[in-house]
């Protein structure tokens, strides 16, 4: 079992149950999935960027990426409907917990001048989105093989009903929030 999942079952569930006084154990919020998205506008001119981004995202997450395509045409960006413009990965179960563990304990502390992540990036329904400016903070990425620095969005989807519950869940799991 993943280390973070063990922590969730042993400690976090009891803490959340006492903090929010849930009547049923099934009411306790849990992490449903983690979506890692890399949007690449430069892929319009150079499709090779998308291949390297997909390979890097697969190395970071340990799962095959899905190429995302443009939903509609935008003439000012020279974008046609159906053109590949990014890649994403949806993590669930064991890979999700392992990725979150590596993100919170290894990757985020490697960010320059890291003081913690913002506690305000919740969407109103308990889900948390985190933006990362460069993929080099992940130890799986070889610094010499990187052709261009690319950022990514990481969305942690929880079953929490409010932001307060979602924040408590992530805080107890070890997310380094800024004070």
Curated annotation (Swiss-Prot):
NCBIfam families of this UniProt entry? PRK00010.1
* Entry protein name: Large ribosomal subunit protein uL5
Q: Oligomeric state and partners?
A: Part of the 50S ribosomal subunit; part of the 5S rRNA/L5/L18/L25 subcomplex. Contacts the 5S rRNA and the P site tRNA. Forms a bridge to the 30S subunit in the 70S ribosome.
Does tRNA-binding count among this protein's keywords?
yes
Question: Which biological process terms from the Gene Ontology are attached to this UniProt entry?
Answer: translation
Q: Which gene encodes it?
A: rplE
The entry's family comment says: Belongs to the universal ribosomal protein uL5 family.
**Summary of the function given for this chain in its UniProt record:** This is one of the proteins that bind and probably mediate the attachment of the 5S RNA into the large ribosomal subunit, where it forms part of the central protuberance. In the 70S ribosome it contacts protein S13 of the 30S subunit (bridge B1b), connecting the 2 subunits; this bridge is implicated in subunit movement. Contacts the P site tRNA; the 5S rRNA and some of its associated proteins might help stabilize positioning of ribosome-bound tRNAs.
GO CC annotations, alphabetized: ribonucleoprotein complex; ribosome
Family matches, as PANTHER family: 60S RIBOSOMAL PROTEIN L11-RELATED (PTHR11994)
Organism name: Pelobacter propionicus (strain DSM 2379 / NBRC 103807 / OttBd1)
Superkingdom of the organism of origin: Bacteria
List GO molecular-function terms, semicolon-separated.
rRNA binding; structural constituent of ribosome; tRNA binding
Q: Which Pfam families match?
A: Ribosomal_L5, Ribosomal_L5_C
């Amino acid at each position: 079992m993943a280390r973070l999942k063990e922590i969730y079952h042993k400690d976090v569930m009891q803490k959340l149950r006492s903090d929010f006084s849930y009547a049923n154990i099934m009411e306790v919020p849990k992490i449903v999935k983690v979506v890692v998205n890399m949007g690449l506008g430069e892929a319009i001119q150079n499709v090779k960027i998308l291949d390297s981004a997909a390979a890097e995202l697969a190395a970071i997450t340990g799962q095959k990426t899905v190429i995302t395509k443009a939903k509609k045409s935008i003439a000012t960006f020279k974008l046609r409907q159906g053109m590949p413009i990014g890649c994403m990965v949806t993590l669930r179960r064991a890979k999700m917990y392992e990725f979150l563990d590596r993100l919170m304990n290894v990757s985020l502390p490697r960010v320059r001048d890291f003081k913690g992540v913002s506690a305000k990036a919740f969407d109103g329904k308990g889900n948390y989105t985190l933006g990362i400016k460069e993929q080099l903070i992940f130890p799986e990425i070889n610094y010499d093989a990187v052709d261009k620095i690319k950022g990514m969005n990481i969305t942690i989807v929880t079953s929490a009903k409010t932001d307060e519950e979602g924040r408590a869940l992530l805080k107890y799991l070890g997310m380094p929030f800024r004070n």
